[in-house]
UniProtKB/Swiss-Prot annotation:
Gene3D superfamilies from the UniProt entry: P-loop containing nucleotide triphosphate hydrolases (3.40.50.300)
EC class of the enzyme, as a word: transferase
PROSITE patterns: THYMIDYLATE_KINASE
Keyword annotations of the record: ATP-binding, Kinase, Nucleotide biosynthesis, Nucleotide-binding, Transferase
Protein's UniProt name: Thymidylate kinase
Family: Belongs to the thymidylate kinase family.
Length: 226
């Protein structure tokens, strides 16, 4: 890079997570950021939760099919925890240790928003699961994409076409408004890690906001050589 230098420890990659409600545009923005980073010479690993590793993808199917909901909020949270444990051990940590940037579509903030704030799973239960599954691992940066609920649900419906909504898309409007509030609170509670991004506009304008946040938080400007 000609004009920026990475803020980083020796040898370790960077861990960036994308969060937000349904239809916020996370999948699009994570791909656009990956392309930008690769153009700057970075090695990038794209992944997602629930899922991201073979074992975790099995859990993803169980959760999004609605089977987890039948077991109750705490049992569903255990499914997420099992998936995350497999994902962290087999994908995220190895990639970071090799110096790659890991861009993850959802991580533990989604568990806190969906199962904690809305599913009413107690904070001490979530904290215990977090200690077991991720230990000291924490994203270097979390980008929370924010859109009005009606906009997000309309996008989600357009994306799936004639397909049936998944477990969370099928929830009522009150659920989704509560979800948006939960992500706002996460951003407010941890401003050093989280950046709330207005994702109402199209992909290109939003990608500029994403890149600005990455540059500001994970890179530092250096004087151009004269």
């Amino acid at each position: 890079m000609a004009d920026v230098a990475l803020k980083r420890g020796p040898g370790r990659g960077r861990f960036v997570t994308f969060e937000g409600g349904e239809g916020a545009g996370k999948s699009t923005q994570i791909k656009m950021l990956a392309a930008r980073l690769e153009s700057e010479g970075m090695r990038v690993v794209l992944t997602r939760e629930p899922g991201g590793s073979p074992g975790a993808e099995i859990m993803r199917h169980l959760v999004l099919s609605g089977m987890g909901k039948l077991l109750g909020a705490e049992a569903e949270t255990l499914l997420f925890a099992a998936a995350r444990d497999d994902h962290v051990r087999n994908v995220i940590l190895p990639a970071l240790s090799q110096g790659s940037w890991v861009l993850c579509d959802r991580f533990f903030d989604s568990t806190r928003a969906y199962q904690g704030s809305l599913g009413k799973v107690a904070p001490d239960v979530l904290n215990a699961m977090q200690r077991v599954t991720i230990g000291d691992l924490k994203p270097d940066l979390t980008l929370i994409l924010d859109v009005p609920v009606e906009v997000g649900l309309k996008r989600a419906a357009a994306r799936r076409g004639a397909g049936a909504p998944d477990r969370f898309e099928a929830e009522d409007i009150k659920f989704h408004k509560g979800l948006r509030d939960a992500f706002h609170k996460i951003a407010d509670d941890d401003p050093k890690r989280c950046v709330l991004i207005d994702a109402t506009a199209g992909p290109d304008p939003v990608s500029l906001l994403v890149w600005d946040a990455v540059r500001e938080r994970l890179f530092t400007a250096v004087a151009a050589a004269s």
